[in-house]
């Protein structure tokens, strides 16, 4: 069995494939390149009136890249209604290495000193590959996603890859596109250098500013 390194993982994502495990305790990784790929158009994020109110009077402190490993562990943890996860120890180790290389990123939502929601993924060129999100209180993952999209728009990104779609992601604007179209968009977006560290002083203003993507 070939050992997967961070370098191999980066090349795989750039080629349009990503790894998953069948279960947290399954050490084997499987390469996935679905016929229909989930993406969230950056100008297509659905922000309801009630969510706008939450963002305007945000009950969370939102941070970037401060507790990446903890976000990863929370995403991998079982929750009511989902006893199993595709994030195994190998994925945790690989993405921790990617974070150390400056490629892995997280968005974190806090209430006081409690981490109550967040997401993590991989930034390459003008693409953000969203891996997983979690929420322990109402709206936490939605707020994290809004902050992510605002940052991607401000930073000049062109593609937010969600891998698959879920009811939650579809309600926020995610759609499925055919594999050939995804690969074409991926190739174009990788030619752009997005800036994940860009300052985002006003999330709603960033979300309301068209990016063309």
UniProtKB/Swiss-Prot annotation:
One of its GO terms (cellular component) is cytoplasm. Its EC number is 2.3.2.6. It is an enzyme of class 2 (transferase). InterPro entries: Acyl_CoA_acyltransferase (IPR016181), Leu/Phe-tRNA_Trfase (IPR004616), Leu/Phe-tRNA_Trfase_C (IPR042203). Belongs to the L/F-transferase family. It catalyses: N-terminal L-lysyl-[protein] + L-leucyl-tRNA(Leu) = N-terminal L-leucyl-L-lysyl-[protein] + tRNA(Leu) + H(+); N-terminal L-arginyl-[protein] + L-leucyl-tRNA(Leu) = N-terminal L-leucyl-L-arginyl-[protein] + tRNA(Leu) + H(+); L-phenylalanyl-tRNA(Phe) + an N-terminal L-alpha-aminoacyl-[protein] = an N-terminal L-phenylalanyl-L-alpha-aminoacyl-[protein] + tRNA(Phe). It comes from Rhodospirillum rubrum (strain ATCC 11170 / ATH 1.1.1 / DSM 467 / LMG 4362 / NCIMB 8255 / S1). GO terms for biological process: protein catabolic process. PANTHER family: LEUCYL/PHENYLALANYL-TRNA--PROTEIN TRANSFERASE, LEUCYL_PHENYLALANYL-TRNA--PROTEIN TRANSFERASE. Signal peptide: none annotated. This is Leucyl/phenylalanyl-tRNA--protein transferase. Keywords: Acyltransferase, Cytoplasm, Transferase. It comes from the Bacteria. GO terms for molecular function: leucyl-tRNA--protein transferase activity. The keyword Cytoplasm applies. Functions in the N-end rule pathway of protein degradation where it conjugates Leu, Phe and, less efficiently, Met from aminoacyl-tRNAs to the N-termini of proteins containing an N-terminal arginine or lysine. Its main location: cytoplasm.
